[in-house]
Amino acid sequence: RKSLAEANITSKDVCFVNAHGTATHDNDKVEGIMLEKIFGQQIKFLSTKGYTGHTLGAAGGLEAAFTAAALREGWIPASAGFVQQDENIPVRPITEQTQINGSFAVSTSLAFGGNNASIVIAKD
C-alpha cells in the first residue's frame, strides 16, 4: 500500500503484479493473502522466478526488469512451474501468456527476516 500511495495511484490502476513467488508454502500463502487484500481476487499476477530460479540478491532487480519489459511489451508470460492451486491461497497466478493494457505494474520482493519491498513501475 505504501508503494501505491507514494506513486499516487490506487490498486485499480495496476494491470499486473510480478510476485516474489518463492514456491514455499508459508511465503506463498502470505503473499497470496496480501495480493488478494490489496488488489482483489481478479488481479493478474505471475512469478518470473520459475524461469530464472532464485537469483538470491539479484532477484528483486531482475524481477523488476522483467516487470518493466512486460509492461512495455503489453503481455506477461505464464507462471512457469505452477501445477496446483493451494486451497489456502486466495488468488491464482496466470497460467498462459496474457495480454495486459495499463500504465502501472508492481514487482514484490520478500526477503529473509521480514525485509519486504514493492516497486511500482510506470509505462511511458
PLM feature spans:
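Conserved "HGTGT" condensation-loop signature of ketosynthase/thiolase-family condensing enzymes
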Residues: 1-124
